[in-house]
A protein has these predicted regions:
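Hydrophobic anchor at the beta1->P-loop junction of P-loop NTPases
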Residues: 7
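Conserved C-terminal guanine-recognition region of P-loop GTPase G domains, centered on the G4
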Residues: 105, 109-126
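N-terminal phosphate/diphosphate-binding loop that engages ATP/GTP or pyrophosphate donors
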Residues: 21-83
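The conserved Walker
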Residues: 11
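Conserved lysine of the Walker
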Residues: 15
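Phosphate-binding/switch loop-helix module in NTP-utilizing enzymes
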Residues: 76-105
């Protein structure tokens, strides 16, 4: 398995926007990147009248939709517990990097996206696994030593940090 980095922060902080920049920058260089995105909502991936939704409604445990352009697998959990992050990671095809949006308290290295204007506290003071913070405010006094502080408004600098982190970090 390649490297895994969580991208965490409160709703509205800009996690997905930053991830778009990071994935695009890495993919443009030919790097294979996977993404796992967690949602607390009941996600509807296709309209109920479409074939794959109808088959899931009929009782199929999993439905795989395949075309010359992409493959999608939808598994209905029904009464099963939500799989943990390790299980989800094991189901992905190999990649140099898997970025994980959400799973705030998972035991993986993380980049926090922190935007104080949304009115939520930073997570990094309570999570030693946060290795960097991308924010639109300067590094506060008292931020722990070794914590990278990145400019959220400069995605290229966050990408440069990610390149260095990938060279230095140990693959799990």
């Amino acid at each position: 398995m390649g490297k895994v980095l969580g991208v965490v922060g409160w709703s509205g902080s800009g996690k997905t926007t930053l991830l778009e920049h990071l994935v695009a920058g890495l993919a443009a260089r030919g790097m294979r990147v996977n993404v796992i995105k967690h949602s607390h909502h009941d996600v509807v991936l296709e309209p109920p009248h479409k074939d794959s939704a109808r088959l899931r409604s009929a009782g199929a445990a999993e439905v795989m939709l395949a075309s010359p352009y992409r493959i999608a697998v939808v598994r209905e959990l029904r009464a099963e517990p939500e799989p943990g992050l390790a299980e989800l990671l094991s189901q992905l095809s190999p990649a140099a990097l898997t970025l994980v949006e959400g799973y705030k308290w998972a035991a993986i290295p993380k980049l926090e996206v922190h935007r104080p204007s949304i009115g939520q506290p930073a997570v990094y003071p309570d999570d030693e696994l946060i290795v960097a913070v991308a924010s639109n405010v300067p590094r506060p006094e008292g931020a722990r030593a070794g914590l990278a502080w990145l400019d959220l408004d400069d995605p290229a600098s966050v990408l440069a940090w990610l390149d260095e982190w990938m060279k230095l970090s140990v693959t799990p």
